């Protein structure tokens, strides 16, 4: 009949502009304030949604807070309707609605007439919201389990702020390193700013200024790995010494996390990949959100973990770093997990895959994560003793490596992996089985594993 035809690709300027914006408020503004058809459509549905939400306040809830929370908790919105309205500017958008002949609820007009132009307001560490019933601002009564870093920072608790990370005093002798990447604020890839801030925080603990630390923030994802552009640039320019130095800097930092004088509690959530896993694993304890998608995925880009990830997986496979390695089965499982770049689909699965330890804490409500991590850090700080440096790691050695090589050869013959995949697998097997020095009767130490890990990483980075 000719009625069917291929779908035309539609492009709107407002979407392009919004995509380039970094934070949610700027994205929403870009979508609503443009002059193309896409923006007009977005404003139309947004204006109707905001007015509808305002009209429902006294019907389905006594306050705006529970409506916002219902949309966030029940429907996965990043912000509730009244939080969105604040982002857009209440007075500005209300004037626009009135000029377009829309009927704005009277309680919003009364709020604006009172001199208040936002539904929520933060002052001196306290958050208030406008109550239509009382026709005045009301203090937001947060649960003692909740901890909002942005709210806490209004109390002048930021010790130092860098481009991508900040040091924050959480109170009670606990320090926090918060990530806020300026390059990719949703993925938070590791850069030198992260490493410098973590090292500075550990220095402050070692000097006795703080007794414990939390590694965590409240962004979209914990950390999606290293800055691959930097590694690629060094590799393209054959700057192997600089690349090796960068990897060693990361390794040294993760070892400092492991052996710090005070306990460090990591709080991973959502995407926690590659280098993000390597930051989390050496901590004294982890308080993970139930929805944590964790994995060492370096094999996917032709590398192996380079920031200590192999060492952590070995220690985790040895049941928390103690006891003798069983006849290679545990390392074989680790080899499969890292070699196939398996990503846990939950914090519980991350325990099963060996990314997390069995005694790590899992929480369902992310609003409770920082407070839970802080409480755990305080508990651990009592008579805290750093772990013992391991010089007694008994790994499978050449015998175990041969078995892994045979498995790789079988995968290659079946067409499941390429020649280069096989090469990556052999490098990974070399590290996990303890290189040339290891064997069931010969022990290796932690630094040796880190050294051969770094050598393998740089070697693979040089492959074309």
Regions found by a protein language model. Name each.
Residues 224-226:
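Extended, composition-driven regions rather than compact fold-specific motifs
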């Amino acid at each position: 009949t000719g009625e069917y035809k291929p779908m035309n690709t539609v492009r709107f300027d407002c979407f392009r502009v919004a995509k380039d914006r970094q934070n949610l408020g700027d994205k929403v503004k870009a979508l609503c304030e443009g002059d193309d058809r896409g923006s007009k459509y977005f404003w139309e549905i947004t204006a109707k949604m905001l007015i509808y939400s305002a009209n429902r306040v006294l019907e389905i809830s006594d306050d705006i807070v529970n409506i916002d929370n219902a949309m966030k908790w029940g429907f996965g919105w990043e912000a509730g309707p009244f939080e969105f309205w604040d982002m857009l500017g209440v007075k500005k958008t209300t004037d626009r609605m009135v000029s377009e002949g829309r009927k704005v609820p009277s309680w919003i007009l009364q709020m604006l007439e009172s001199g208040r132009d936002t539904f929520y307001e933060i002052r001196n560490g306290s958050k208030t919201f406008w109550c239509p019933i009382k026709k005045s601002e009301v203090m937001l009564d947060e649960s003692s389990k909740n901890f909002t870093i942005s709210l806490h920072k209004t109390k002048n608790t930021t010790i130092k702020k860098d481009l991508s990370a900040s040091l924050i005093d959480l109170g009670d002798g606990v320090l926090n390193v918060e990530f806020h990447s300026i390059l990719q604020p949703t993925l938070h890839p590791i850069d030198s700013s992260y490493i410098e801030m973590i090292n500075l925080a550990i220095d402050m603990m070692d000097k006795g200024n703080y007794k414990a630390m939390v590694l965590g923030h409240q962004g979209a994802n914990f950390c999606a790995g290293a800055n691959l552009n930097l590694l690629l640039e060094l590799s393209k320019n054959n700057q192997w010494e600089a690349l090796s130095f960068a990897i060693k800097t990361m390794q040294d930092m993760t070892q400092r996390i492991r052996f710090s004088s005070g306990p460090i509690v990591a709080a991973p959530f959502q995407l926690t990949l590659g280098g993000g896993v390597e930051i989390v694993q050496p901590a004294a304890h982890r308080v993970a959100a139930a929805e944590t998608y964790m994995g060492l995925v370096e094999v996917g880009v032709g590398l192996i973990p380079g920031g200590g990830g192999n060492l952590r997986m070995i220690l985790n496979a040895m049941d928390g770093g103690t006891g003798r390695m069983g006849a290679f089965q545990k390392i074989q499982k680790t080899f499969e997990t890292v070699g196939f770049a398996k990503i846990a689909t939950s914090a519980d699965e991350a325990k099963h895959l060996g990314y997390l330890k069995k005694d790590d804490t899992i929480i369902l409500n992310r609003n409770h994560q920082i407070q839970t991590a802080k409480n755990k850090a305080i508990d651990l700080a009592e008579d805290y003793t750093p772990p013992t440096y391991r010089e007694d790691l008994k790994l499978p050695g050449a015998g175990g490596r041969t078995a892994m090589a045979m498995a790789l050869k079988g995968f290659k013959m079946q067409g499941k992996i390429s020649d280069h995949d096989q090469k990556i697998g052999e490098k990974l097997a070399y590290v996990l089985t303890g290189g040339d020095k290891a064997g069931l009767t010969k022990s290796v130490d932690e630094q040796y594993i880190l050294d051969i890990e770094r050598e393998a990483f740089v070697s693979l980075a040089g492959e074309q």
